[in-house]
């Protein structure tokens, strides 16, 4: 086993690029926490306010509620800056990719980032907005000379979630996974609870966290020849 496979890249500044408020916690939370524990600064670029979610754990205007939830979760995770944009939830695929990428370029330059962290190109849950947010980061990366690291699921976890919940979960075979890291989920769990409109009992989130245990799985999407690793 490659010893480096269990260590995150030694980045001092990371930009997480996501589609919705809660993606930074439900999806990337434990990895963000691990980067921060290693001394990195982490910023988040979130393209939508998540106003189209069908999960409504609280009453009220969902876009406004979820903006507040994201702010609270970011504080718990230790995120430095959140860039929250107002693209339509569920409509990122219709937005100009180069325009989305420009936002990622700007945020990465603002924080002098060493790399970007995203959802896998599968979108993990098959959500088209997840796929589009990742594409924006992948387009931006070579223009700022950055690597892109993707959070993914191993096939066995995705298959079990699919069997139990009939959702569109998409994993990767072990040969396509570059990192298996041990994580402490304490900050992630606290951040998840900052999203009461979405962290509803019995949702796929809880079953996924149970199946993953204290591990997360990552793969390279973009490697620059001269980028820091």
Predicted feature residues:
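Active-site rim/loop-helix segments in enzyme catalytic domains that contact anionic ligands
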Residues: 1-112, 138-143
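Metal-dependent de-N-acetylase/amidase catalytic core
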Residues: 1-15, 94-229
């Amino acid at each position: 086993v490659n010893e480096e496979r269990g260590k995150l890249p030694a980045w001092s500044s990371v930009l997480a690029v996501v589609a919705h408020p809660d993606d930074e916690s439900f999806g990337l939370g434990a990895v963000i926490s691990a980067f921060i524990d290693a001394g990195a600064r982490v910023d988040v670029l979130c393209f939508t306010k998540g106003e189209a979610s069908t999960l409504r754990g609280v009453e009220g205007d969902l876009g406004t509620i979820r903006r507040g939830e994201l702010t609270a979760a970011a504080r718990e995770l230790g995120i430095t800056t959140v860039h929250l944009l107002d693209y339509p939830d569920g409509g990122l695929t219709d937005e100009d990719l180069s325009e989305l990428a420009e936002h990622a370029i700007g945020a990465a330059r603002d924080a002098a980032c060493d790399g970007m962290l995203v959802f896998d190109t599968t979108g993990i849950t098959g959500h088209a907005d997840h796929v589009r947010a990742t594409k924006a980061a992948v387009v931006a990366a070579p223009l700022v000379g950055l690597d892109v690291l993707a959070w993914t699921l191993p096939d066995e976890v995705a298959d079990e979630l699919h069997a139990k919940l009939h959702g569109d979960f998409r994993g990767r075979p072990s040969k396509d996974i570059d990192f298996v890291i041990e994580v402490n989920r304490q900050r992630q769990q606290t951040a998840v609870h900052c999203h009461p409109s979405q962290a509803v009992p019995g949702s796929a989130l809880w079953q996924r966290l149970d199946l993953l245990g204290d591990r997360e799985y990552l793969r390279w999407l973009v490697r620059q020849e001269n980028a820091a690793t």
